[in-house]
Design a protein with these regions (language model features):
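Short hydrophobic membrane-inserting helices
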Residues: 1-83, 87-90, 119, 128-135
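Intrinsically disordered, low-complexity polar regions and short flexible loop motifs
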Residues: 3, 15-20, 107-381
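Transmembrane signal-anchor/signal-peptide helices with a preference for the extracytoplasmic
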Residues: 83-109
């Protein structure tokens, strides 16, 4: 009988160890309480069994221990029933947790599928960007002595597409600002550089003929004069098929090295591009808030998105933000906390506040191990 007691005690110990490994570390406090209650029943069952074994060992007339059998049966039956109830409860709970894990895995797969679909659409948006422009080709005819005897200029249609569009956009925006800077130098009122940049971006985005080219801090007469001057520059550029591309600015040369008619606007291209890019970032961040992914995973997914953006795309994103069009980008820290400007070519930022200065407060709050805000460093070398 002593062997039976030892075996029973071993079962209790194994139950405790398994309960700890399977439930205490993994599941809720409710399960811990249930396991403690179950353990209490097992302890009671152990002492009941020990008492029964002692009675059987000391019995002289087994015909008189029938009441003990009834007693033991009365104790064991409900204990076994309770044990069975708890065992079934644990089984149902384990199944519930398993189903929950399956659901979470499905949600994770659904999220990844949607994210990579949005990533694919972003790449399509970039690849489908197109500007129909012009180019001038010079063909020379040589004689036998290799002297030029004839020069023929022909004009061809030039298509700028894909990421090259953003390269030209940066040139156009900077040139537009430099034209405004030169015009403002002789105007009766001197406007702040940031206001000139905001007006330049509106002209760049909507086109110089748009009624949306207006700014509260700049007089309408100045804006009308700017529009007239830009139309003249556009006509020279277009009539020369981009050969007339260097103009005199304020103590500098304005280099309008693009192959299409400048200052006609990019609203139809950039509007959709920025909306989709913003929606993709917002989608990832919202999934973090829902608890589906953590902050590190959000950064990893957005790093994949950012890797699809060229330096000029990030440069245009910064300009779009700094002049106010894209101010919502920083409401939830998309540019800083989630590092959407991490690869920004800081040295190419012209006429706007230095990004290191603009985001200085956030840079000072970065903790060790969180990584720099900018790939090129958060402190100017």
């Amino acid at each position: 009988m002593a062997l039976v007691a030892i075996i029973f005690l071993a079962i209790i110990i194994v139950s405790i160890i398994l309960g700890w490994g399977l439930f205490f570390k993994t599941y809720s406090k409710l399960l811990i309480a249930a396991l403690i209650l179950l353990l209490s029943f097992l302890v009671l069952l152990f002492f009941t069994t020990i008492h029964s074994i002692d009675v059987l060992d000391n019995a002289k007339d087994y015909s008189k221990i029938g009441p003990y059998g009834d007693y033991i049966g009365g104790i064991l039956n409900p204990l076994i029933a309770v044990f069975a109830v708890f065992a079934a409860g644990f089984a149902f709970y384990a199944q519930y947790e398993a189903n929950k894990q399956v659901q979470d895995q499905f949600k994770s797969q659904q999220f990844e599928s949607q994210f990579f679909e949005m990533l694919r659409l972003h790449k399509e948006n970039v690849n489908e960007m197109k500007i129909t422009g012009y180019d001038s080709v010079i063909q020379e005819t040589l004689d036998n002595e290799k002297k030029v005897v004839q020069i023929v200029r022909s004009h061809n249609t030039k298509i700028i597409e894909g990421r090259k569009v953003f390269v030209s956009m940066v040139v156009e925006l900077i040139s537009c600002y430099e034209f405004l800077e030169e015009i403002n130098s002789t105007w009766k009122v001197r406007y702040d550089p940031i206001d000139l940049l905001k007006l330049s971006y509106r002209i760049f985005f909507f086109g110089s003929n748009s009624e949306l080219v207006i700014l509260e801090k700049i007089d309408i007469d100045f804006i009308d004069h700017v529009k007239i001057q830009l139309r003249k520059h556009r006509k020279r550029h277009r009539d020369s098929y981009s050969r007339k591309n260097v103009y005199q600015g304020l103590n500098k040369k304005i280099e309008l090295f693009i192959k299409y008619s400048p200052f006609t606007g990019h609203e139809n291209r950039l509007g959709h591009y920025y909306r989709h890019l913003y929606s993709t970032v917002k989608y990832v961040v919202n999934k973090e808030r829902e608890g589906l992914i953590d902050y590190k995973q959000s950064r990893d997914y957005l790093k994949i998105l950012r890797s699809q953006m060229s330096n000029d795309e990030q440069l245009m994103l910064y300009y779009n933000y700094i002049i106010g069009f894209g101010k919502d980008w920083e409401n939830d820290g998309y540019l800083t906390k989630y590092r959407m400007l991490h690869n920004l070519p800081i040295d190419k930022v012209k006429y706007a506040e230095n990004p290191r200065v603009h985001f200085q407060e956030f840079i000072n709050s970065i903790k060790p191990g969180e990584g720099h805000l900018f790939e090129w460093g958060d402190v100017e070398q």
